[in-house]
Regions:
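Asp-based, Mg2+/Mn2+-dependent phosphohydrolase catalytic module
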Residues: 1-5, 107-115, 127-267
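Glycine- and other small-residue-rich loops at beta-strand/loop junctions that grip anionic moieties
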Residues: 99, 123, 156
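N-terminal helical cap/lid subdomain that shapes the substrate entry/recognition surface
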Residues: 2-116, 132
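A structural preference for short, hydrophobic beta-strand core positions in alpha/beta folds
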Residues: 40, 122, 243-245
Length: 267
């Protein structure tokens, strides 16, 4: 194997929705309806996984678990997870379009990848209706990945590798090592690693910083540098082979991975 064949991007915080704001907005509103204040940090803790799994993880947080007991009179169980998940979905759909702006440089990097003969895939923790809505919004802005897979399609989400492997099968790639997974969360990194692919973290546009483009640009240079370094360290600790600030900076990383593949290296 001498070269890369495909790149798989995440959605919120990587290619759309600078700061990954939509899922935080919907999740905090969901728990507020039950009198539970969910902090942004708690909402972001397990970002990137399938939203039903995400709700389950939030309920298991000690503070949230205590609050749930106090307000409901008992412990939560899978019936409550399903109830919350069903209530979450329309909440997420309501805010999705408002946070669907394609992150700067995404369309251009996709064009460059296609120019190199690479396929472009995408995975997400969103449901199929949510993903379809994002696909429509992104296409109107010029971003059209060649494949888009969600947990509904595979029976499970991150950190399991199934979505990435389904795309690899659809693209008929020669080996998982010929694919690069790019995302802004720890679960993105683990998804790529578990699939046997190269994992590239995105530090400043996504969940680890959690800021809109306008808020990010309003920071002083030293503030941006500090937040970027902190996000980079977290993604590196999750196992990322590389970390970039935004997807528009992916080209040099791909060149290095191509060289490593040609030298016989694997992820």
């Amino acid at each position: 194997m001498k070269r890369l064949e495909a790149v798989i991007f995440d959605w919120a915080g990587t290619t759309v929705d600078h700061g990954s704001l939509a899922p935080v907005r919907a999740m905090t509103e969901l728990f507020a309806r039950y009198g539970i204040r969910l902090s942004d940090a708690d909402a972001r803790r397990d970002m990137g996984i399938f939203k039903k799994d995400h709700i389950r993880r939030i309920l298991a947080l000690p503070r949230i678990e205590r609050a749930w007991r106090e307000r409901s009179g008992g412990a939560w169980d899978e019936r409550h997870v399903q109830m919350l998940f069903e209530e979450f979905q329309p909440l997420q759909m309501e805010v999705l379009e408002a946070f669907s702006q394609v992150i700067g440089g995404t369309v251009e990097i996709t064009e460059r990848l296609h120019g190199r003969g690479l396929k472009v895939g995408s995975t997400t923790g969103y449901t199929r209706p949510m993903l379809d809505a994002l696909l429509r919004c992104a296409a109107a802005q010029g971003y059209r990945p060649d494949a888009a897979v969600c947990p509904d399609d595979t029976g499970g989400g991150r950190p399991r590798p199934w979505m990435c492997l389904r795309i690899a099968l659809e693209f008929r790639v020669g080996a998982a090592a010929a694919v690069v997974k790019v995302g802004d969360t720890e679960s993105d990194i683990m998804e790529g690693l578990n699939a046997g692919m190269w994992s590239v973290g995105v530090s400043t546009t996504g969940n680890e910083v959690g800021m809109s483009a306008a808020d990010w640009e309003a920071l002083r240079d030293e503030e941006r540098a500090g937040l970027a370094a902190k996000a980079c360290a977290k993604l590196r600790a999750a196992g990322a082979h590389y970390v970039i600030e935004r997807v528009s900076l992916l080209d040099r990383v791909l060149e290095e991975i191509d060289a490593r593949l040609a030298a016989g290296e694997r992820p």
